[in-house]
Amino acid sequence: MFNNSIHKVSICIALTLTFSANAMAVTEIPFWHSMEGELGKEVDSIADRFNQSQPDYKIVPVYKGNYEQSLAAGIAAFRSGKAPAILQVYEVGTATMMASKAIKPVYQVFKDANIDFDESVFVPTVAGYYTDSKTGRLLSQPFNSSTPVLYYNKEAFKKAGLDPEQPPKTWQELAADTAKLRAAGSSCGYASGWQGWIQIENFSAWHGQPIASRNNGFDGTDAVLEFNKPLQVKHIQLLSDMNKKGDFTYFGRKDESTSKFYNGDCAITTASSGSLASIRHYAKFNFGVGMMPYDADAKNAPQNAIIGGASLWVMDGKDKETYKGVAEFLQYLVKPEIAAEWHQKTGYLPITTAAYELTKQQGFYEQNPGADVATRQMLNKPPLPYTKGLRLGNMPQIRTVVDEELEAVWTAKKTPQAALDNSVKRGDVLLRRFEQANK
């Protein structure tokens, strides 16, 4: 009896030790990101399902603030030897990450993990933003890519006597529509998020105009800024005139306009396609999604939109097992059913051709009119060498410069020409600083 009890206790101890050993064998992989609200919930959901799908790795998502904050936190953590394994970085941080010496290229991560990963699964216009210009290999993995789109309140349109199924196609139409919307009682006719990305960078690409020389920096770090040309100045003048009339309202440098839209304050906003998740969740009215407006007088417009959003960078200095887990997770993210779900639930672009095709097969676009607008904008025309994106050093700081200068326009302290001229002048100083630091 006594010996039998000892035997049972021994078995229990052995099982406990076995389970403990198995638990200890799980490799935790920190994943720092900037997805909050509904987007953060979806990141957590995907990570949980990956963790449950296998016993060896545990992805640990950690929200680290907005894009600027998470990039700064990631670089600082790398310098102190405490970097996460995966860091989500917005698209304008690409040149900074490439020059940081803090990363392990994604293609190398897969190679070292003995995973035969086909980089051609990604939509070319998305992957091209994150590839090495010389080798064409992926440096980071596309994740939440977006383009700006136009959201409009169908009920406000109807009240103003406008066709709720016809969003404005040109900036001239938008200006006329917002005046009618305001007259019909809308406190805010039009607002825009991410003004540098939407009103300068994407406006330029959408009209077939370069943002900088050297094909927007893809061909070298000696690029200079070029967005102070007549077409861009004319556009900012139109917004300035609308602002003076009260038809365009400026709420901030990031996506503040999104909440103003889904709260019903603003009848129209231009914002990231990735804002669709929160708008769909919070809006208590019927809304529509339209393409970005274009200048009716511009030749050959619209051209193609350029992506925003972010990609996933793998940080250097981790052990072999961590990189194996990272590779497994990155491969999991591009499974057609996972990538399609991420696209459908968030409004971000389908990053793989298979995800796009699966979404079509499932009838998602037919059931959700407007959900394919971002994709159609990106594929509207084959990109020109200077409309496939931008790769400029110190771009986060350049965006801050643009924000400061445009704010001077909205407060009537500067003319559009003076503001854009000064943006280019100040921005070029930042480009030369980056060029010198990375020779």
UniProtKB/Swiss-Prot annotation:
Keyword Transmembrane among UniProt keywords: no
Transmembrane feature ranges: none
A single cellular component GO annotation: periplasmic space
Subcellular location(s) per record: Periplasm
Signal sequence, renumbered to the chain: 1-25
UniProt entry tagged with the keyword S-adenosyl-L-methionine: no
One Pfam short name: SBP_bac_8
GO biological process, one term: transmembrane transport
Binding site for sn-glycerol 3-phosphate: Y67, E91, S146, S272, G309, Y348, R399
SUPFAM superfamilies documented for this protein: Periplasmic binding protein-like II
Keywords for this protein: Periplasm, Signal, Transport
Matches recorded under InterPro entries: Bact_solute-bd_prot1, SBP, SBP_1_CS
Major localisation: periplasm
Family membership noted in the UniProt record: Belongs to the bacterial solute-binding protein 1 family.
Quaternary organization: The complex is composed of two ATP-binding proteins (UgpC), two transmembrane proteins (UgpA and UgpE) and a solute-binding protein (UgpB).
Function (record text): Part of the ABC transporter complex UgpBAEC involved in sn-glycerol-3-phosphate (G3P) import. Binds G3P.
Record protein name field: sn-glycerol-3-phosphate-binding periplasmic protein UgpB
Protein species of origin: Yersinia pestis
Gene name tied to this protein: ugpB
